[in-house]
Amino acid sequence: MKKILLIVLLLNFMCLAQELVIGEERVEPGIVFIFEGAVKDHIMPMGMHLDEDQTHIHIEARVNWDEINIPEGTPRGGFVPYLHITAIVKNQKTGLQTFIDLLPHINLVDNFHYARNISLPGGIDDLYSVTFNIVPPTHIDLALHKDWLNSYGEALLKGQSFSYKSVYFGEICRARRN
């Protein structure tokens, strides 16, 4: 009976795990990036986003302060706003690629995150290379106080680029939201 219960619980957990972690990175001064492929979703306002039925996946970057070794006064695990994040998804078989601007989103699962519903540039069972580019906020987007300047310099963080190869989105493409 215990084995059956364990199997049922495991299957339920697997059904609920509808996000593919593409990569995780930590950059100074204590910012954690979690890049994911998630199940596509209905996103508003509709005039700024593709219809759910025209896309394959919801590509996202969860960007939060770490829990440790972060600047004084920083909310542990809090969302990091004002970043400009793009992604390039390239089909490894055909070379076709798509460029995406990830925009701030909010939901009841991840709360604030950067994301976009996208159509893959090829088949859902193809392998893809994914590159995420992070551009820090401009001086128009974010003003810095003297204490930050003295401790961390003239930017929130340095520009970053993270690349991942052989990403398989097939399972996420076939999954549906509850």
Q: What residue ranges belong to the model's regions?
A:
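Short, compositionally biased P/S/T/A/G/V-rich stretches that sit at domain boundaries
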Residues: 18-53
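Solvent-exposed serine/threonine-rich low-complexity stretches and specific carbohydrate-binding patches
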Residues: 98-108
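Short acidic/polar inter-strand loop motif in beta-rich domains
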Residues: 134-149
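Compositionally biased low-complexity segments at domain edges in trafficked proteins
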Residues: 160-178
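Short amphipathic, basic-aromatic surface patches that mediate peripheral association
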Residues: 57-78
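Aromatic sugar-binding surface patches on proteins
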Residues: 108-117
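Extended low-complexity, serine/threonine- and proline-enriched intrinsically disordered segments
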Residues: 77-97
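Sec-dependent N-terminal signal peptides
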Residues: 3-16
